[in-house]
């Protein structure tokens, strides 16, 4: 039996990590209740993700950039997540993370775990404060599916040898596109 390289792509919030990063940020801003209502509706597919993300991020306006380190300290990887990445890498597979969450929080974790590919939203910062805006294109349902295709192509993995793992409406397209 010959080796078949696979790409395993995981959602981040409440899948690879146990928390929702936006809710950790919202708690620091004192707007957790408002943000949680919007998050829940978006995860159920009742609200367009991009619109809901922009509404939630707007509520974070004025938070200091230092909040990212504080939130990162509160993040707990899902049990077995780090071991899974190490195992997949040791077997020659490729690991990617995609998130409707934020590069600002996850990048050090991605670097530490040597994740092969990563795509998430970037919160805008001006003069050390969050502006309440997202830079660039929003990582939504379609962007997660597109990332799977792009990462597989770059890693030279056939789509039939991709795996996608997620927990919400935002993950359905990438899961449908994956080979498993």
What are these regions (language model features)?
Residues 72-180:
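C-terminal cap/substrate-recognition subdomain and adjoining C-terminal extension
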Residues 1-123:
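Alpha-helical substrate-recognition element adjacent to the catalytic core
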């Amino acid at each position: 039996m010959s080796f078949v390289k696979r790409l395993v792509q995981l959602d981040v919030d409440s899948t690879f990590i146990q928390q929702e990063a936006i809710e950790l940020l919202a708690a620091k801003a004192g707007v957790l209740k408002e943000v949680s209502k919007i998050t829940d509706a978006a995860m159920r597919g009742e609200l367009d993700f991009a619109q809901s993300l922009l509404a939630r991020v707007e509520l974070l306006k004025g938070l200091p950039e230092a909040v990212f380190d504080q939130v990162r300290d509160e993040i707990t990887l899902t049990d077995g997540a780090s071991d899974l990445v190490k195992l997949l890498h040791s077997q020659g597979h490729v690991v990617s993370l995609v998130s409707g969450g934020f590069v600002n929080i996850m990048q050090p974790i991605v670097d530490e775990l040597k994740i092969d590919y990563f795509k998430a939203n970037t919160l805008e910062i001006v003069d050390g404060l969050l502006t309440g805006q997202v830079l660039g294109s929003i990582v939504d349902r379609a962007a997660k599916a597109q990332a799977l295709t792009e990462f597989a192509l770059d890693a030279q993995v056939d789509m039939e040898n991709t795996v996608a793992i997620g927990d919400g409406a935002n993950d359905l397209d990438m899961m449908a596109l994956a080979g498993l």
